[in-house]
Amino acid sequence: METDPILKVEREPEFTPSPAPEAIVKDIEQGVAPVSQNEPDRPQHWITRVVIIVLIVLAWYFFSLLLSMMNKWIFSESKMDFQFPLFLSSCQMLVQMGFAKLTILAFPRYQPNKKDNFSWLEYFYRAGICALVTGLDIGLSNASLETITLSFYTMCRSSILIFVFFFSVIFRIEMFDWILLCITLVISAGVVLMVATETQFVLSGFLLVMASSVLSGLRWALTQKLLLDHPWTSNPFTSLFALTPLMFLFLLVAGLIFEGPVRFIESPAWKEFGPFMSVVILVPGTLAFFMVASEFGLIQKTSIVTLSVCGILKEIITIIASTLFYHDILLPINIVGLVITLCGIGVYNYYRITKGNKKEAEKEVEYIVLNENA
């Protein structure tokens, strides 16, 4: 079984034909054309595999798009206007922790070996730093949706790749590469075109989403350094179970400081939406977990090239959906900037996969694709 480097998942092995039976060998030696007993099954096997992959991709798109749309609806000033993204994000961490634990219990192959457990000191050092940065990344990105459009948010989050490249060089995970620098500059130009002509530009929202993108790049570097080589966090479910308790604590403390417990308790949303608030608290965390699970399945079943292409299509679908449902306005220059950025991302991924350290490239590309809408 081949092991995926970022999530250490076992990919399905490629088809390898079994040795020919003696009867078939004799037929070949005698000039008789053998009839393959497996031949009728091959098209059916191929079709089944394609159907499974398509269903996984659709599930990934569904959960990702629904999560983005729901977060925008919850936090937008013109919609629900629930002004507590940090508190709500902390609740989502508890939901994801519960689902992660249930998955580990239900599927023993995801259970880590007890001898590989973190010591408490190691846990707070390794997981604590990653959880703090990840929690801030998610909290700030959710907070930005209060004031900026979903399409603008998605375009800004596409800049994650720039910061992944920057921090990979700073932390000496990757050697400096002039070609990659040129590609990231092209992507930066595309982001500038998207941002400079935004018709509903709000500086505070822009700063929040860009800060979350910077933290996402830092999060990638810290994850490479502190977590991925540890056997206890060898798959996304044990990683979630390790990180979410600390992420909950960090986000809760941040919510108490910046949003205030009294304002949270006395929010008019509790009276206005009543029992629906339980949906607001539980559903986003559930969607986030199943998005991670579908990503995991996609990584198992496909190549990194397929994942990269699907990730770019996901960005386009999210932006189209935001223009249809939330009536976001895109000017021609926005679209030009978006095309430049997405093409730059495609070229970057292709270069990283075909040149240099292939294992590190696959880890980086997977992270970028799966976290643009985190």
From Swiss-Prot:
Q: What processes does the entry annotate via GO biological process terms?
A: triose phosphate transmembrane transport; UDP-glucose transmembrane transport
One Gene Ontology term of the molecular function aspect: triose-phosphate transmembrane transporter activity
**Origin organism of this chain?**
Schizosaccharomyces pombe (strain 972 / ATCC 24843) (Fission yeast)
**Name the record gives this protein:** Uncharacterized transporter C22E12.01
What GO terms fall under cellular component here? cis-Golgi network; endoplasmic reticulum-Golgi intermediate compartment; Golgi apparatus; Golgi membrane
Q: Name one Pfam family in it.
A: TPT
Spans traversing the lipid bilayer: 50-70, 151-171, 175-195, 201-221, 238-258, 273-293, 329-349
| Highest taxon of source | Eukaryota
Annotated coiled-coil positions are: none
- Report the sequence similarity comment from the record: Belongs to the TPT transporter family. SLC35C subfamily.
Protein topology in the membrane: Multi-pass membrane protein
Places the protein is found: Membrane
Q: Which UniProt keywords apply?
A: Membrane, Sugar transport, Transmembrane, Transmembrane helix, Transport
- Could you confirm whether the keyword Cytoplasm appears in this record? no
